[in-house]
């Protein structure tokens, strides 16, 4: 009897301890896991003819099915190129009439731009063999181009929400010497190389490229410093994505794409995918996220609407597109130069970083989020009030430092911060990079000053890429414009995260390359976030992909999508935007 009792006690006391994760697994509702889908690519298309000016030929294949829910991934790219030999000489068709034609790209120039001392052709052929060079009026070479002009000239991909190659030629002036007055040129500037203060005499005027209709410097103005606390990294990611969508003058969730994140095949990762991967490292209940954000505007611009001069790289790629529709070549063009181009916007920079807070450490140290908000953010003496951080007067930066030199309170708060994710855009690389390492008021102040001369585009309006062809002086491009429009519809569908669903319980569908995954919130498991601890929790709906266009009737056609990818559950929000889209035809 004693032996039996001892053996029973041994069984009870000597079983392996149940971990916290195993306890969670025991509570999780075991919903049915969706069937895995393997990635499928189409067969390669036939090679194109050899392009004589490139000695290159192309082929492509389509993404028939991205892998999802643990399916087998695809290897390789969807575009391919190979060297070739063409017996045809590289000759640009004469299409400029009495005007000058650039040798490499075929750009047409008025005769007064030839031998004017400026390279209006990328290859400089307009300045070859010049006996008499006519200098541009007022010797405009002394002026630097307006800050940020190269950034505004870039295309934009609304799927990845990233910049593409140049659409406008930001180096073309058309023989004009139009300058923009910088009202802050008298202000004292700091030269970090020489470590001295000086007046910016050289920055009194900047030269405006031809494709810019307007450019106006503005006194630095920020949007105020916002302070946001998130329990779930997915909610933080959605907020960041929505802010980017609104900055781009389009609400992605209500438009053609209807997806939180889409990655383009052929692009080696995206900024947002990298950010999400960092957040995923802290997908545990003990971590919260503090977002500190401000946007600084330094200039406003508007691009020329008509007679746009395209970047010569884009012009050359456009010339080489076939007249007959070839989705592979047109989709590669879109992937290179963007789905859209910028028509107007604002220059400046954004200062944003995410503090990963260890709530268990905070509780043991007696530290609150309000305490931490007064220490971090790169602004020094900042006061927290009603969910906002407000800079008061001159920011001294003496209130708190993470690496507190003898400051016990600062050290305590620093211990509560597990990680800092920096997302600074704009400004000189030295000061911008320094913000993530040194959050002093001096560093922030000089970063803000450097934005005037090293800005990025922070808010902008845009148009579909095929529309730019309507506003150039190029002839005989209507067939290619229609092909580009058709390819854009197909491209937006092929690389759309709607193909990745359904992700249940507010999981986020993500398409990276040819692979889908669902980013799950806290307490969710499974490849489709289908396993949850909470019964009856609200889950928002997500759109299916758009269906095919209907036949053209009375000058219009339509297509539909359904809010079933998945449908809303337990009172969750319906899908935003329209179920039916109409288009002139």
From Swiss-Prot:
It comes from Oryctolagus cuniculus (Rabbit). Membrane attack complex (MAC) assembly is inhibited by CD59, thereby protecting self-cells from damage during complement activation. CD59 acts by binding to the beta-haipins of C8 (C8A and C8B), forming an intermolecular beta-sheet that prevents incorporation of the multiple copies of C9 required for complete formation of the osmolytic pore. MAC assembly is also inhibited by clusterin (CLU) chaperones that inhibit polymerization of C9. The chain crosses the membrane at residues 248-256, 259-266, 377-384, 391-396. Component of the membrane attack complex (MAC), a multiprotein complex activated by the complement cascade, which inserts into a target cell membrane and forms a pore, leading to target cell membrane rupture and cell lysis. The MAC is initiated by proteolytic cleavage of C5 into complement C5b in response to the classical, alternative, lectin and GZMK complement pathways. The complement pathways consist in a cascade of proteins that leads to phagocytosis and breakdown of pathogens and signaling that strengthens the adaptive immune system. SMART domains: LDLa (SM00192), MACPF (SM00457), TSP1 (SM00209). It holds the Pfam family Ldl_recept_a. SUPFAM superfamilies: LDL receptor-like module, TSP-1 type 1 repeat. It is found in: Secreted; Target cell membrane. The keyword DNA repair does not apply. Heterotrimer of 3 chains: alpha (C8A), beta (C8B) and gamma (C8G); the alpha and gamma chains are disulfide bonded. Component of the membrane attack complex (MAC), composed of complement C5b, C6, C7, C8A, C8B, C8G and multiple copies of the pore-forming subunit C9. Residues 499-530 form the EGF-like domain. This is Complement component C8 alpha chain. InterPro entries: C8A_B_C6_EGF-like (IPR048831), LDL_receptor-like_sf (IPR036055), LDLR_class-A_CS (IPR023415), LDrepeatLR_classA_rpt (IPR002172), MAC_perforin (IPR001862), MACPF (IPR020864), MACPF_CS (IPR020863), TSP1_rpt (IPR000884). The lineage of its organism: Eukaryota, Metazoa, Chordata, Craniata, Vertebrata. Residues 136-499 form the MACPF domain. Residues 94-132 form the LDL-receptor class A domain. Residues 1-20 form the signal peptide. Disulfide bonds join 39-74, 50-84, 53-90, 96-108, 102-121, 115-130, 140-177, 375-400, 498-545, 500-516, 503-518, 520-529, 552-585, 563-575.
